[in-house]
Every structure is written in C-alpha cells, then in structure tokens.
Amino acid sequence: MIGTWLGELSREQFDSEHFQRAPLALPRVARGAIPLLTWSTVIELVPKQTDMLVVRNGALRSDPAPSSFPEALALFREGYSLVLRRCERHDAGLRQLADAVAAEIDGDVQIQAYLTPANHFSFGWHYDCEDVFIAQTGGTKEYRLRQNTVNPQPTLDAMPKDMHYERETTPMMAATLVPGDWLYIPRGWWHMAHAGEDSLSISVGVLSPAARSLST
C-alpha cells in the first residue's frame, strides 16, 4: 500500500527522508482510496460505531454520539465534525487497508474516518503518538504543520492534557488536499486541519512499539 501511494518516490527514499522525520504530501497517487470512504460508506458505518467523537472548532461535544445517519448529518450541518474511530472493525474495505499497512510497517494500525463540514475544523493544534497517513476522499482540507520541539517523542502512556502549543517556535508549513491526495504526518508533529469544502478523509494511524510507553 505504501509503495502505491508513493508514486515516483521510492520506499527507500521515503524511509530515509520522511518516515518518523518529516511530513510528506503527494497529489493524486491515493486515488484508489476514494471509494473506501464516501457518504454511502458513512451511512453504513454510523449505526455500527460505538466509538465516535463529535467536535466543533476545538470543542468536544459531551452529549452521546449519534446512533443514526440522520442524527449525524444534522450535527454535521450544525458545524460539527464526526470522527469515526476503529473503522477497520466495521468495514471490509477499510479492514483490508489496515491489514495492508500492517504488513508493511511494524506497529498497531487503526483507521479513523474524519467528516468535517466546510469552513470548520475539528481539533485545534495537537500532536499524536502515532505516525499518521491521511488520504483525502472527498472535498478539500488544508493541513498546517509544525515540528514539535516541546515533546518531540510522545508516548501513549505519557500524553499530556496540556500540550503547551504556545511554547512552540518552529516555522509553519501547509498542504491542501483534494480527493486522491495524501499526507504523511510523523509521530509528534503538531498539526491542525481546516476544511474548505465538506471533507471526507481516511486517517491511518500506526502506533510503533517505541511509541507505546517510555519504558520500551
């Protein structure tokens, strides 16, 4: 899977220049992912989801997550992003994608679907303890990224509640994705994303053995 998304870039070059080092955005080479997350997929996924976040412009909604697509769509139209987690458990195509990534990269793989309404964002500036591969399947989304010097090697068992983004001094970079584009965000890199149009994207997170805990 990784090789397919790299286009003309070799796997060796990706590993030496980008993997766990620096972001990479490539156009059009992830077009095969577009059918994996459409609104039809969402209609099927929402009633199956037991792990969903509803968030709008950095604020997490505390009420129970919607259990039907009409409920989810109503919240989406109010400006809420829907984050459907562990989608590989509920969809065969996304499970195949997760298995393909797991066969190429050592780590625990999970897939999230992000549905973000136009002119909104879900989470504010944050970083993850996973390496993240994002395929845009609908609409447009601008990602802003910064290297993390505050906590450059975060681990799952020591993720702080306050990430202290205000302490960061590194320059910002940006990439806008359209359907078929993809973006790699290394573990620990700051990022946030703003939808220009109603946006659908697949986020493949890979938790490496080293990122599980400080003791590994």
Residue ranges and their predicted role:
Residues 1-17, 31-181, 189-216:
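Active-site region of the double-stranded beta-helix
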Residues 184:
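Conserved beta-strand-loop-short alpha-helix elements that form
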